Amino acid sequence: MDAQLVADAQDGDREAFAALATATYGRLHRVAQNILGDLDRAEDATQQAVVDIWRKLPQLRDVARFEAWSYRIVV
């Protein structure tokens, strides 16, 4: 993941966050679907995770760990 994109999103750049969400949505959705076993519930969980990621992004200390951090949120 592009560390600068993550840093820009942390600074409140909505376009950077939209790019992050687009880049990671599929992977987050697969994780949710594997856990929940239901496509509709996985979609809901992924959408909620994206909202939670936006809210919690300022708390991320190491932008290089964005992907692992975002997976923890979806779980």
Predicted regions and their residues:
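Amphipathic alpha-helical repeat scaffolds
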Residues: V6-A7
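Acidic, Ser/Thr- and Pro/Gly-rich low-complexity regulatory segments
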Residues: M1-A3
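Conserved short hydrophobic patches within well-ordered secondary structure
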Residues: N34-L36, L57-L60, V74-V75
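A short, glycine- and basic residue-enriched loop/turn
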Residues: R14, Y25, L39, L57-V63, ...
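Short, charged helix-capping/linker segments at alpha-helix termini
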Residues: Q10-A19, H29-Q48
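Structural recognition of an alpha-helix C-terminal capping motif at a helix-to-coil junction
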Residues: R30, D44-V51, R55, A64-V74
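Hydrophobic/aromatic residues within well-ordered alpha-helical segments
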Residues: L20-T24, L28, V74
